[in-house]
Amino acid sequence: MSFEVLEQLEAKIQTAVDTIALLQMEVEELKEEKQALATEAGELKASRHELEQKTQQMQEEHSAWQDRIRNLLGKMDDVE
C-alpha cells in the first residue's frame, strides 16, 4: 500500500473515532436530560396529586357551607 492510501485510511479512522466520541458525549447528555425529565415528571405528578386533594377538600367545604346556608335559610323561613 502506498503512503497516501495509509494517510487516507488514518484520516478516515480518526474521523470515525471523533464521530464515535461525539456520539458518546451526546448519548450521555441525553441520558442526563432523560433523568432530569423523569425527576421533573415525578415532581409534577406529586404536585398534581396534592392539588387534586386540595380541590376535593375545597369542594367538600363548599358543599358543607351550602348545607349550612340552606339550613339557615330554612330556619329564617320558619321564623317568618
Swiss-Prot record:
Its main location: cytoplasm. It holds the Pfam family ZapB. GO terms for biological process: division septum assembly; FtsZ-dependent cytokinesis. Residues 3-80 form a coiled coil. The keyword Mitochondrion does not apply. Keywords: Cell cycle, Cell division, Coiled coil, Cytoplasm, Septation. It comes from the Bacteria. It is found in: Cytoplasm. GO terms for cellular component: cytoplasm. The keyword Cell division applies. Non-essential, abundant cell division factor that is required for proper Z-ring formation. It is recruited early to the divisome by direct interaction with FtsZ, stimulating Z-ring assembly and thereby promoting cell division earlier in the cell cycle. Its recruitment to the Z-ring requires functional FtsA or ZipA. Homodimer. The ends of the coiled-coil dimer bind to each other, forming polymers. Interacts with FtsZ. Belongs to the ZapB family. This is Cell division protein ZapB. It comes from Vibrio atlanticus (strain LGP32) (Vibrio splendidus (strain Mel32)). The gene is zapB.
